[in-house]
């Protein structure tokens, strides 16, 4: 028997079957770095329209976690896809470098500033620590395959950036948005500093829930309001609170002007509380025998005075819209120094804003003898006993509720009125302008708009001052007596900024005021406060985007972060940009959900359900992690586990195998001389290129709308269905057995070339390493990297008015699927081994029969059978298999006649008819020794 293997065009490629990504990717990264791939891309895109995705800076502390990976990969997918769309899309990564977490780490190692090191040395240690953390995180981000200007990132601790942050504050002051006030702010006693809204988390806490009686100063006057002459015992207004420690700061009781308040006789006293809450309060205090004597609207009780339950003064009843009937008594204990609503209503009535609590969370001397120096949370029980002893305590119980805590220490925080600097939301219309700007931004998902609108509408003034060591100084001078800002504040801030630009923030603390104030130095003092770190990152649209040359003065097109950043970076950036420039800093804002485990649980080291991106990259490779990110709908929670990553690896193998098949069958193909013109190609090949064209339209649309999971789904459908289970199966016969240089084979290779040229680009933003690897095996001259080009423009499809148009082949796909069902059943019944052992007769209605007959003898190649005949549907025998999908189709399968050709494996009756090639069929003889078979359709 002759060996005809050498006459076959067997697939061959150096592109490996196995990805071995964990081993292979680091080598690719080294090449990218050595070649300066990012620089090559920038040069290639120079002069094109820009798309700027501004990187929200991660905090320079600790190793990256899976959430960081999601964020950076999503950004990288967008930047790369924009590049392929024809944009110049520079990506400058950044880091947030100042603030408390770094201070705490340095304190753990070196002690607090002033103990072992001066404040200046402490800042230097903080700078060193941040730089070390950045180096570690940068290595991991690069390992993810994220392309960016990693050698020149922006750091909020860069001297120039620090200077520009000061300039941003100067602009806000110049626009009239800054004011100073002793307002209650979130205060962490462990940090000994104010906290931003975004630094507050909520945890369950058990607190005492108490009902307290404030006795009327003038019993008769209060009773007169109710039209009651006298009652048995004292008259008291009842408040309810879960923060007894705030009672020393009480200066009023707030009532609703609209609610009805009842006078209730119970147990030898008369109590005043909201009428709608009488039943629930009486039940809570254990009173069963009570009588409602009368009721009046809250407005009638305004300015009635009541005795403080343990301090030697009385307080007024005041009216406020913040009073609700959700819980309590309808009478709200009001301490202007310990709550924003309390502060607002106290200001309205001109009440004292008392703050008896020090920065350490202990009562200041002179508060009350048994409370001085006591921590406020420890004081709760003491105050409850004081109330019990005075007879003012009506009820006490323990209550579990959600309580604000410090994001860093996880400890309960307090509201505490301290002199702070605020960006005002309303004095110059910042709130109104911000709400207007929000409407001009595209929010992805769209629910983000309502979320941030609600936050802006309800947020208090922004406290931007902090009492910290490691931060950008506010760089202000205030008068020692009046505490007013220096009249030359803006000029002085620019002078400070110039010095900071040279020497960093230490220049402020080293500055002798006389150097820039002259004689005014005797009357003015430096403000010691630093800026909230959210001001640092929130001003990067000005301190970074506006000044980096690669952004060429363009505003950011997109901000992209986790959904917690509506109240964080998105908010601070919006506030600062609107206060500075009157406009939003971004055109689009995209948010992604948090990562959870396979059961939907929040990731936690204590549970042990975290997934380390480093482990994933070391075991599976970064492309698997990237594919998982892209294939997950980021608008909700993003589930990840070993099983989920395994599924991503399975999908990856399908895509890789498709690419390998395409490359292997381009063996010997030179696009410069072997390309077949579209009009001369086999129709099926043109259909396949058209499939790629249709897929590309869907994929590009999905990239444009940032629906990356749809990109992956469409890519998988193309590889698995249109290619894998149809086209690539059909072409094997022609590709392997036709003459090497025949139009039949070159047509097929032309299609494969167009398809892989498109496929590698679709993959590039997501599976960047694999796309780069494929790119290196593609035939023909090309740029060195796929990332410097654009989407493939060489695709074409069948015309709608052609007889064998897309609709024709869609019908053939269905027929092929139905015939496969019959073949699979025959194989299960041991009637045939493979499909080439079968011949089929298709009994079709007139319309379908016309389509099938149009293929002539090539129908069998589409069906992968050795024989295929078409007959009238009405002539089908009774035992013919009826298709459920195609009502006008019945199928009869029989064993193929003739002998098996050892070269093409088809069964035919002409095997051995040519003496010189006695073992093979006539078709193979033509392909081996003749002019080669002709294919028109398949």
Curated annotation (Swiss-Prot):
Residues of the signal peptide: none
Chain residues that bind Zn(2+): 901, 904, 921, 924
Broad class of where this protein is predominantly found: cytoplasm
GO BP annotation list: isoleucyl-tRNA aminoacylation
Cofactor, free-text remark: Binds 1 zinc ion per subunit.
Gene3D superfamilies reported in the protein's UniProt record: 1.10.730.20, HUPs, Valyl/Leucyl/Isoleucyl-tRNA synthetase, editing domain
Catalysed reactions, semicolon-separated: tRNA(Ile) + L-isoleucine + ATP = L-isoleucyl-tRNA(Ile) + AMP + diphosphate
Subcellular location: Cytoplasm
Positions that bind ATP: 605
The entry's keywords: Aminoacyl-tRNA synthetase, ATP-binding, Cytoplasm, Ligase, Metal-binding, Nucleotide-binding, Protein biosynthesis, Zinc
A GO term for molecular function: tRNA binding
Origin superkingdom: Bacteria
Pfam families given in the database record: Anticodon_1, tRNA-synt_1, zf-FPG_IleRS
Cofactor entry: Zn(2+)
GO CC terms: cytosol
Enzyme Commission code: 6.1.1.5
Motif ('KMSKS' region) on chain: 602-606
Motif ('HIGH' region): 58-68
Binding site for L-isoleucyl-5'-AMP: 561
HAMAP family noted in UniProt: Ile_tRNA_synth_type1
Record's function text: Catalyzes the attachment of isoleucine to tRNA(Ile). As IleRS can inadvertently accommodate and process structurally similar amino acids such as valine, to avoid such errors it has two additional distinct tRNA(Ile)-dependent editing activities. One activity is designated as 'pretransfer' editing and involves the hydrolysis of activated Val-AMP. The other activity is designated 'posttransfer' editing and involves deacylation of mischarged Val-tRNA(Ile).
Family under the similarity heading: Belongs to the class-I aminoacyl-tRNA synthetase family. IleS type 1 subfamily.
Subunit and partners: Monomer.
Protein name: Isoleucine--tRNA ligase
Organism expressing this protein natively: Klebsiella pneumoniae (strain 342)
Upper classification of the organism: Bacteria, Pseudomonadati, Pseudomonadota, Gammaproteobacteria, Enterobacterales
